[in-house]
Swiss-Prot record:
Similarity remark: Belongs to the aspartate/ornithine carbamoyltransferase superfamily. ATCase family.
Record's subunit section: Heterododecamer (2C3:3R2) of six catalytic PyrB chains organized as two trimers (C3), and six regulatory PyrI chains organized as three dimers (R2).
Function: Catalyzes the condensation of carbamoyl phosphate and aspartate to form carbamoyl aspartate and inorganic phosphate, the committed step in the de novo pyrimidine nucleotide biosynthesis pathway.
UniProt keyword Oxidoreductase present: no
A single MF term (Gene Ontology): amino acid binding
EC code: 2.1.3.2
Name of the molecule in the record: Aspartate carbamoyltransferase catalytic subunit
Species of origin: Pectobacterium carotovorum subsp. carotovorum (strain PC1)
Amino acid sequence: MVNPLYQKHIISINDLSREDLELTLRVAASLKAKPQPELLKHKVIASCFFEASTRTRLSFETAMHRLGASVVGFADSNNTSLGKKGETLADTISVISQYVDAIVMRHPQEGASRLATEFSGGIPVLNAGDGANQHPTQTLLDLFTIQETQGRLNNINIAMVGDLKYGRTVHSLTQALAKFEGNRFYFIAPDALAMPDYILSMLKEKNIAYSLHNSIDEVVGELDILYMTRVQKERLDPSEYINIKSQFVLRAADLHSARPNLKVLHPLPRVDEITIDVDATPYAYYFQQAGNGIYARQALLALVLNRELVL
């Protein structure tokens, strides 16, 4: 049977059904347990990063190499015809699609990856982040990590902390977890960076429980997952930032009433919002979370590029 993700563009987490998510996570677990170094042996994948990236680019390219694919591309668009000679994004994608079997793309402009699908000639485009819009593979690795640490994706108590207004990771993760039963959300953010109304409306429509809070202390004893994010200094007045920054910092002492199964996650990079002493606690899992990006991205590449995937 042809797998449902074969030759599919992956631009938004909403492009994936619950069944698609579960399939991808099963494949990720299989690839983590049993590497397949020749699965994409005869494939060529373009890694096109039009803006800076550390974790996403390196984990995607590691995923490609570990599956046996050949990798071409760039990490600085200023050294391409688009950056040097004024070539349009449409023309750049039209040309790249002549050379490769799939395109992994990050771009600072919202909607750029969706636009790329119109000019890729049917070559699948995988969104590695487009501005503040979508970052579906981050959501996949977050889901994989939650399932790995909790053994399930339903009946999860999850708190999201920090910049919930502009942080694309928390929007996508909330939308993805809303596909599973019994999850409860705790949103901890200043009013200026609160979760957008469209996310709250979606949860209300689905009759999914959520609550708004002012501090981590209020809920830490109820949580399975504590998902920290960086408060973005550039979004706030300096005086407001100083106040908010100190309010939303996680220290090891804050975890004294945590459940034994709690895991602290963060999409990284962190700045000051998780102190170093948390790293040594059994709750810290953000570096392992970053490592899981390899397996989540391997799974997506394997599914998109294999008509009938047998592992």
